[in-house]
Amino acid sequence: DFFFKKASFISRIGSGSACRSLYGGINFWGSHSDFAFSSDLYSTQISDNVSAEYNNFRDVILIIDDSKKEVSSSVGHELMNNNPFSDVRFKKANNNISKLMNILKSGDLNEFCKLVESEALMLHALMMSSNPSYILMKPATLLVIDKIRQFRINSKIPVCFTLDAGANVHVLFPEKLSEEVMVFIREELSLFCINQNYISDFVGSGPLQI
């Protein structure tokens, strides 16, 4: 455990995403008053009190734009220092962590979808309201978001989207529903991708010590 904790600590300096990818399954990074195990210095694996619904999740990344990122993650973080909504965002994120932990325990996929999408859109809203401001989404991003929401309503399948700091869309859904969702992705969503390209990923077991 010390090896991975140290690896998470070191990788945090270069990448927050790497920091919270040292373990398989669900990882928690960031200090929170409700969770004694939490830390800003390294991530922690969460395995207790997590519904089996989240054991085998898929992530399909739709390549809407394959050009270089308009703004780096470090620059994006700096913009939050003077953003007029940053304090509200920090409080909201803190509350959402508590909500998420309850959702992970209950296995409520509908509430999971609502929270994930809210977080994604809030990130982009902050970038649009910063100074200088950035619109990271492309027109196709919004069309895909609308398609996913309509599909969820019509099919009653708990599939949702999240966004990175760019135009690409991550489609999240349980592995057990992959047959129906992958048909939707291939036949409809891939049409919005560069050369119909997308990356099909899944929850892994994390890196190995060598």
Model-derived features: positions:
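C-terminal nucleotide
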Residues: 49-210
